[in-house]
């Protein structure tokens, strides 16, 4: 899409993915990229100015620090890391390297979010007392249990594990479903929550909460071998408002009839925004029946 950008190299531990994606690049650009199975060798390529890190979450810290050491600009997929300690290491490396580093909170690029934020900041819905944030993902439901096996042919499983604990290969812990295991990720909260909570914090200009409390578990699918909660509620306490995150795997019945979104609940109305658009739900003055906000 950008004529000033060339995709000259790809790296993946899976030969099947490398073959498919390199063909995709060739179909789009007319040029076949150089392929690597070890990202460190890709970083040695002096013709590369910038890299996109789209590895499983447990690899982000090492990938980013090594890319900065190789003098590359970086776009790193969310979540930035799996721990505060890793994030601190990545921030320090980014500040010292003085390269361009962006984390994939791309949801902010949706025009509806900026429109909703401008309306929120106008004060028309009054004092915000509660922000609700949610993701109900029906398509993230039951996962069949599989026995451990040898890794598929063409997969460098040792490199895939990287800094994660050594264990036998299991189909459920590989590719997209790695998200449901603590060794590699944090479940639906770190997959969808980082997007939705980012919008909530942006709207409220909020940073560190005073306290956080959470409750949840594997309530819907207790017998499958995944580890992260399929149901979760988390309360973030701030000085003059609270934020509530909630998620559920396997069902779509979220707040306001939406499977995902953010709601800013004010004294005069509520702003609800998600990837499909935004709306304002007005409150009434029950003394005279009038709406409490103006468009």
Kindly give the residue locations of the regions a language model identified.
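N-terminal glycine-/serine-/threonine-rich beta1-alpha1-beta2 phosphate-ribose binding loop
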Residues: 1-76, 82-100
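Structural recognition of the beta-strand scaffold that forms the well-ordered cores
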Residues: 7-11, 52-53, 75-76, 82, ...
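Tryptophan-centric aromatic hotspots in well-structured domains and transmembrane helices
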Residues: 18, 59, 75, 88, ...
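Short, solvent-exposed loop/turn segments at the edges of secondary structure
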Residues: 69, 94-96, 155, 175, ...
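A contiguous active-site-proximal alpha/beta segment in oxidoreductase catalytic domains
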Residues: 73-75, 80-159
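Rossmann-like dinucleotide-binding domain that binds NAD(P)(H)
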Residues: 158-241, 251-255
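Short polybasic amphipathic segments
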Residues: 262, 276-285
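Conserved small/polar residues in nucleotide/adenosyl-binding loops
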Residues: 293-294
